[in-house]
Amino acid sequence: PLEKIKESTNAKIISNASAHFDKNSDVIYFDPYKLTGYSFHGLILFNEDLFEEQAISNKDGIALFNILEALKNQRFEISIKDIFIEKLKDALKEDIYFFVNNSQTLPYSLHFALKNIKARELIRTLALDEICITNGEGCSLGLSRPSRIIQAMGYDETTSRNSISLTFTQKLEEKEIEKIVNTIAKKYKQIKVLNQGN
């Protein structure tokens, strides 16, 4: 049907691709709520000149374009994960634990937890030192909710709030790694002491 419409008009065809994708569409959009249960926008524009029609997309198309460009330029560093693990274990001793066997995870990603603090407390304070960590779920962090994924693995709500993730994007010398790890350990211990006073 869209092919026939294309033959009779120069209008841009905007289609909902949640259930069916038609190659004759100029623009497709998704109903993420129906697909995932979460309410957000999903729009893909196929021709760059369509970006001028921002009102159609509430600028989501520009965001998607920028994300695509960022992904094209994305780089990962796979040689420093094991060093980070050992340095973190040395600095944090019994206060660090792992939800998964890190040898079975992506070589540029490290997932761990620190006892008796919420990950968001450490995320905020380390950002001041330009050390960016995440709990892996931006939407949950924004709502101050614990990780749904960790809970699905069988951990309780309190434990799931401890989840921390690092992604390695550049080569670091051992001294740089030690500096980052020491900062993480220092900030963690400060937060832990402050929490004990509450």
Segments and roles (model prediction):
Residues 148-198:
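PLP-dependent enzyme catalytic core of the Aspartate aminotransferase-like
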Residues 74-125:
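Conserved PLP-dependent catalytic core of the aminotransferase class-I/II
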Residues 22-69:
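Active-site PLP attachment segment
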Residues 1-27:
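Catalytic PLP-binding core of fold-type I/II PLP enzymes
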Residues 109-164:
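Conserved C-terminal alpha-helix-loop-beta "cap" of PLP-dependent enzymes
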Residues 62-79, 172:
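Amphipathic alpha-helix from the class-I
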Residues 13-17, 28-32, 99, 133-136:
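General beta-strand structural signal in soluble alpha/beta enzymes
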